[in-house]
């Protein structure tokens, strides 16, 4: 086999072209920067984080369901419970924070006050 090595330098990047057939080729490209005058991005899905206060009486229920949330968690089950569908049940007087998750990320929080 006839190996032919050709060093090509383009735009301060050196490339080694190794040709088995004995023919090496290189193509130089123009890297002149282009200024962007106007850009618009339209997301196909906007994530809305819900952070709000929720006053409840003992025994009341309220749905904090969000279709993008994958899991719900309460920091105080004695005050407010939440099920896998986002239904909050007020258990006793006090405060609790319901955290909504999307995967492992915090999606939003609902601050429950039971009176």
Swiss-Prot record:
Protein name: Uncharacterized protein YjdB
Transmembrane helix found in the keyword field: no
Keywords of this entry: Signal
Organism this protein belongs to: Bacillus subtilis (strain 168)
Signal peptide region: 1-26
Domain called BIG2: residue spans: 36-114
SUPFAM superfamilies noted in UniProt: Invasin/intimin cell-adhesion fragments
Superkingdom of source: Bacteria
Pfam families attached to this UniProt entry: Big_2 (PF02368)
Protein induction: Expression is induced in response to phosphate starvation in a PhoR-dependent manner.
């Amino acid at each position: 086999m006839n190996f032919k090595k050709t060093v090509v330098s383009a735009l301060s990047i050196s490339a080694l072209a190794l040709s088995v057939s004995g023919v090496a080729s290189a193509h130089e490209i123009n890297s002149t920067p282009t200024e962007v005058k106007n850009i618009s991005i339209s997301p196909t899905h906007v994530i809305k984080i819900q952070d709000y206060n929720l006053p409840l009486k003992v025994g009341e229920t309220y749905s904090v369901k969000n279709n993008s949330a994958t899991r719900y968690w309460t920091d105080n089950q004695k005050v407010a419970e939440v099920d896998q569908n986002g239904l909050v049940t007020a258990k006793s007087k006090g405060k609790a924070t319901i955290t909504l998750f999307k995967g492992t990320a915090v999606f939003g929080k609902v601050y429950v006050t039971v009176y």
